[in-house]
Amino acid sequence: MNTNKIAQDEVQDKVLQRAELAHSVWNLRFNLSKVAKRIRMETKVFPEIKINDAQSQLERSRCRIFSPDLEEEHVPLIQGFKCLDSPPPVPPSSSQGEDEENTVDSQY
């Protein structure tokens, strides 16, 4: 009877660990999708944020070192993470002529 209880506790612990892991993975995917949407929005709002070809090739080579199986489509997303260290700048056109209440509700 005692061994049955121990085995049941071990199974329950493994189920809880898997549930916590699944929750963590879901959170990571959710946060990644939010970041991807923000990066796309920033590149549309701020067209001056561009990466020249030399810098792009350098970033791709760095990515290959850490993850050789990384596909080309993921490289711009990784490069965009650098923009998230600080909040995006407020475009000059949106900061002129608005009162305090409108700027609080804005995206920036």
From Swiss-Prot:
Biased composition (Acidic residues): 97-108
Domain of life, source organism: Eukaryota
Region (Disordered): 81-108
Induction profile: By the zinc-responsive transcription factor ZAP1.
Protein name: Uncharacterized protein YOL131W
Source organism per UniProt: Saccharomyces cerevisiae (strain ATCC 204508 / S288c)
